[in-house]
């Protein structure tokens, strides 16, 4: 199972939000590049980056920082936040981003997702953020009446293979991920699902890893606040999921 330490960017700094609220942002790193380097030193090979300014403004804000993260860390980076055009996807991929995560456009303009998959293949990942099973968009500010599973199945039809699933109610709360909903979504959709939101203990990762070993299509997990607060180290987390890098 693949582990993605997370860096959320706000005004060029590494922050974490509580349940997606911009007003509840805690700064954990004035220099995101240093945060990424530390992740690399502990054995990471991947990084999950969210441009929070872009998610709320719907336009790129932190590209210079993203480029520095890629160049200085050597990590495989996936980026989400405010990506709503093919041109924007191409810009990020040219920067060296491995995968782009599409959220709002999957709901608003699904035909754009289809074009993106045709053009960029598996570099396109869908991000489904849900609360009480219903999809939220626009940086989580707006809740829809669309069920997470229904959206996942629609995306599968247009060729999407990878999905990041976030239970908003768990994000940044250190209450544990919604494993039941995540596993159910993976089983019923058949997509490769990355679990996001709420990982607080190594046991959370063990439970996800056990499901993956049983054949559930869980590609990995995103870990954020637990790393910043010292709940466990990234090296410990990597050992749990059986992903070791550089002999760590």
From Swiss-Prot:
Gene3D superfamilies: Aldolase class I. Keywords: Amino-acid biosynthesis, Cytoplasm, Histidine biosynthesis, Isomerase. It holds the Pfam family His_biosynth. GO terms for cellular component: cytoplasm. GO terms for biological process: L-histidine biosynthetic process; L-tryptophan biosynthetic process. It is found in: Cytoplasm. It is an enzyme of class 5 (isomerase). One of its GO terms (molecular function) is 1-(5-phosphoribosyl)-5-[(5-phosphoribosylamino)methylideneamino]imidazole-4-carboxamide isomerase activity. It comes from the Bacteria. The active site is at residues 8, 129. Its EC number is 5.3.1.16. InterPro entries: Aldolase_TIM, His_biosynth, HisA_bact_arch, Isoase_HisA-like, Isoase_HisA-like_bact, RibuloseP-bd_barrel. It catalyses: 1-(5-phospho-beta-D-ribosyl)-5-[(5-phospho-beta-D-ribosylamino)methylideneamino]imidazole-4-carboxamide = 5-[(5-phospho-1-deoxy-D-ribulos-1-ylimino)methylamino]-1-(5-phospho-beta-D-ribosyl)imidazole-4-carboxamide. Pathway: Amino-acid biosynthesis; L-histidine biosynthesis; L-histidine from 5-phospho-alpha-D-ribose 1-diphosphate: step 4/9. CDD domains: HisA. NCBIfam families: 1-(5-phosphoribosyl)-5-[(5-phosphoribosylamino)methylideneamino]imidazole-4-carboxamide isomerase. Belongs to the HisA/HisF family. HAMAP family: HisA (MF_01014). This is 1-(5-phosphoribosyl)-5-[(5-phosphoribosylamino)methylideneamino] imidazole-4-carboxamide isomerase. It comes from Desulfitobacterium hafniense (strain Y51). The lineage of its organism: Bacteria, Bacillati, Bacillota, Clostridia, Eubacteriales. The gene is hisA.
């Amino acid at each position: 199972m693949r582990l993605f330490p997370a860096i959320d960017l706000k005004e060029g700094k590494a922050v974490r939000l509580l349940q997606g609220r911009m007003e509840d942002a805690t700064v954990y790193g004035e220099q995101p590049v240093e945060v990424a380097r530390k992740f690399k030193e502990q054995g990471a090979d991947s990084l999950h980056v969210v441009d929070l300014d872009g998610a709320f403004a719907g336009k790129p804000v932190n590209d210079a920082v993203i480029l520095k993260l890629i160049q200085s860390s050597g990590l495989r980076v996936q980026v989400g936040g405010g990506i709503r055009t093919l041109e924007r996807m191409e810009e990020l991929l040219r920067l060296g981003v491995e995968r782009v995560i599409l959220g709002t456009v999957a709901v608003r303009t699904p035909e754009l997702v289809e074009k993106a998959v045709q053009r960029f293949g598996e570099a396109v990942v869908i991000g489904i953020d849900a609360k009480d099973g219903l999809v939220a968009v626009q940086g989580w500010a707006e809740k829809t009446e669309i069920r997470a599973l229904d959206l996942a199945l629609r995306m599968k039809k247009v060729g999407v293979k990878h999905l990041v699933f976030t239970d908003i109610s768990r994000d940044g709360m250190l209450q544990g991920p919604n494993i039941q909903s995540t596993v159910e979504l993976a089983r019923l959709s058949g997509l490769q699902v990355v679990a996001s939101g709420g990982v607080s203990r190594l046991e959370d990762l063990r439970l996800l890893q056990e499901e993956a070993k049983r054949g559930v299509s869980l590609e990995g997990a995103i870990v954020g606040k637990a790393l910043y607060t010292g709940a466990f180290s990234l090296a410990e987390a990597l050992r749990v999921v059986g992903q070791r890098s550089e002999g760590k």
